[in-house]
Structure formats: C-alpha cells, structure tokens
Regions:
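Cross-family detector of peptidyl-prolyl cis-trans isomerase
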Residues: 2-319
Length: 319
C-alpha cells in the first residue's frame, strides 16, 4: 500500500534495504586511504585519491561521540554524504549537508558494510565507511542510482540521535479520547495503543486530540520529524499500518514540497510538542482522497484514525 512515507527525498538511502551482515568491527587495510576533514554537523571535505579502491571494507571513527550506542534494532537520525568511487574517478552522489542541512532517519536494514560500520557507534560520532561492492549493492549494483557492480561507496555519517525500535511518547497522560471520538488504550510497553471506534459518524473536518502531552519543542513546518504511529479505518476499526508492528520509527520532513506524508499529518502535527501522543481523525480529502487505497482496503469515503507518538523534531544538521 501507499504507506505514510509515500515519497523518499533520499532515494539512495531508500535503496539500501539489503540483507545485513551485522557486526561492528572495522578493517583499515583497504587502500588507498580516503581522508576527511571538517567538524561534526558541517559538510565534510572528502579527499578520494585518483586510484582504484581497495577490496576490503574500511571503517574509521573520525569523531568519537559520547551518546547512546546504536543497537542492532535501533533507528537513528543522522546526516550523510555518499560518494561513488568508480575506477580512478569519484563523484558526490547525495548529501544531506547539501540539501539545507536536513537530517534523515536511518531505519530498517542497511547495506551490509554500512551496518557493520555503524552498529555500536555512539551518537555524536562521525564515521567514515569505504564500502566495496560485495558489502554494498553487490555485483548487480543499482542502475537507478547510477551504481555499477564494481563501484565502491564512500559514506561519511554524522550520528545525531538514537531511537529504539519500541520507542513511545514520554509525556503526561491527559486523555483517552472518547466523547464522539475513538477511544485509545495504551498497550504494553513498546507496543501500539488500541483504537476503539465509536458508533457515530466521524467528524467532517480534520480533528486532533492530544492524548499524552510532551514537554519538548513544538513541531514546525520544515522540521525532520520522527514518530511511531498506528493507523485504522473508522468504518470498521481495522488497522492498516503500524510502525510499532515493524519495530521501526518513521522519519519525514513535515510540510515538504512535494509532500512526504498525507495532508492530515502535515496539518495536524504542526504545533504539537515532542513527547506527545496525538490522535488524528482524518477525513478522506486530507487522507488518501477519492481513490483510497485498494491494497490497504481504504475506500475513497473512509475516514482514517491515526495515533502518533512524536519522538523528535529537528530543524538543522545537528538536531
């Protein structure tokens, strides 16, 4: 189905969902050496020699952070620059430092070499990973990204904030909903809340209800927002999507153009505070529109109910 993450502003990161090999060791025997200068949170200056890359994974922690260590099932917010090293030439493929300094969420399975490089690293670290084809996209490469099966990838990653796979809102409980709106009941720690639909008709307009009030900063349009969520259909109460079920927080830029999320999210989450749990009751016009979603069994007339936990909101490169 068309998930909340309908658009990836960073297609190469979206393409790194390959089987991971795990581990946190590094191998510095790859030659010739890549050098990096610059400070954490700023665009790195990367020097790649005009020679062929080595055949082994090379990992170097350029800046040692003192935050939470990245666990295998965690997601994290970070900035990155990716270079393509092809033969004796190289070029920049993507950089969040070059696109307004907006960090992105690393979630799900990473390229094997990138996973090896990052697992166990502490937040606040800058990590260099020189990834040979066998620990990157393999012999098939990625034609859409312009990566051949013989190309080496050079990543420089600034690790900002760690999010556990079962992270939830941390604020003060203020409501369970109800009074004509769905009732929301918290589940076991780290699991999605349950949503019970009322018997009446849904509201005609977008409706928000704060269930847990966080004390963090307010979400502003243009922020990178990290959330957990569960979505259900008002008509029958069926759940059609849940980040908790995947144990994978979701990150997006709110108010982006083109939109990365449905309209009801862009409008309903701005102004809400980090640490909050918010219920969004979203009419069709602010959701999937008249076409709905066949795969998710959402009709064009369906009102959707989301319970969203706001884990973080970030406006710049260093969070």
């Amino acid at each position: 189905m068309r998930r909340i993450a309908v658009i990836s502003a960073l297609p190469l990161l979206a393409a790194v969902a390959l089987a991971g090999c795990g581990g946190s060791s590094s191998n510095s025997s790859a030659a010739p050496a890549v050098t990096v200068s610059g400070t954490f949170g700023k665009a790195p200056a990367v020097n790649i020699p005009a020679e062929k890359a080595g055949s082994k994974l090379a990992v170097e922690t350029l800046v040692h952070g003192n935050g939470q260590a990245l666990g295998r099932s965690d997601a994290f917010l970070g900035n990155y620059a990716i270079y393509l090293w092809s033969g004796t030439s190289h070029k920049l493929l993507q950089s969040t430092f070059k696109t307004g300094g907006k960090p992105t969420l690393f979630a799900g399975t990473l390229l094997p070499g990138l996973e090896t490089a990052l697992i166990g690293q502490k937040m606040g670290s800058r990590v260099l990973a020189v990834i040979p084809p066998k620990e990157g996209f393999g012999t098939s490469g990625d034609a859409q990204a312009g990566i051949k099966g013989t190309d080496t990838l050079v990543f420089v990653v600034d690790m900002i904030k760690d999010f556990a796979g079962n992270a939830s809102a941390t604020g003060q409980h203020v409501s369970n909903g109800g009074s004509g709106l769905p009732t929301v009941t918290a589940g076991a720690a780290g699991t999605a809340p349950a949503i019970k639909m009322p018997s009446g008709k849904p509201p005609a307009n977008l409706t928000t209800k704060v269930l847990i009030k966080g004390t963090g900063p307010a979400v502003a349009s243009g922020d990178t927002v990290v959330v957990q969520y569960v979505g259900a259909i008002w008509r029958n109460g069926s759940v059609f999507d849940s980040s908790w079920k995947r144990s994978q927080p979701f990150g997006f830029t709110i108010g982006a153009s083109p939109s990365q999320v449905i309209k009801g999210w862009d409008q309903g989450l701005v102004g809400q505070t980090v640490g909050s749990r918010v219920m969004l009751v979203i009419p069709p016009a602010d959701g999937y529109g008249k076409t709905g979603s066949t795969q998710a069994h959402i009709k064009g007339t369906d009102t959707l109910v989301f319970v969203v936990d706001i884990l973080g909101a970030y406006s710049g490169t260093n969070g």
